[in-house]
Amino acid sequence: MYSYKYPRPMLTADCVVFGARRDGGYALLLVERGNDPFKGMWALPGGFMEMDETLEACARRELEEETGCAVQGPLEELGSFSAVDRDPRGRTVTVAFMAVVEEHPVAGGDDARQARWFPLDQLPPLAFDHKEIVAVALKRKFGAALPQSEAQ
């Protein structure tokens, strides 16, 4: 049996899902965390990758489990986020994915207390480093950064 002497970080996938609104604007899909760390705070849908799935499959699974949202089209890989202290549970690297869908009803499931669309100018404070991830997504998708008044 092969022995691997190097420590292994945890790997997660997070989803930045923008909802196209009827008024021509966009909203961001967030979940209220039901468990620690950051219990009760809002976060991007996402979670830990299982050994038998790809990162994109992980992103799709977590998104559907936590919000009921099943993205039919492509998920764009946004990038990896690997700050050493980004997760208090231990060394965790996330790969973020992005999609744009029509805004539709969502509901919290699995370890998410609730799921909700937030107008981009009314984002709550976000758990982990999700403010940074959202800022990268906004810049990539819309060419705009997150205004200072949003997402502490």
Name each region found by the language model.
Residues 146-152:
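Short acidic, hydrophobic short linear motifs in intrinsically disordered regions
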Residues 1-43, 56:
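N-terminal strand-loop-strand
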Residues 49-146:
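Unchanged
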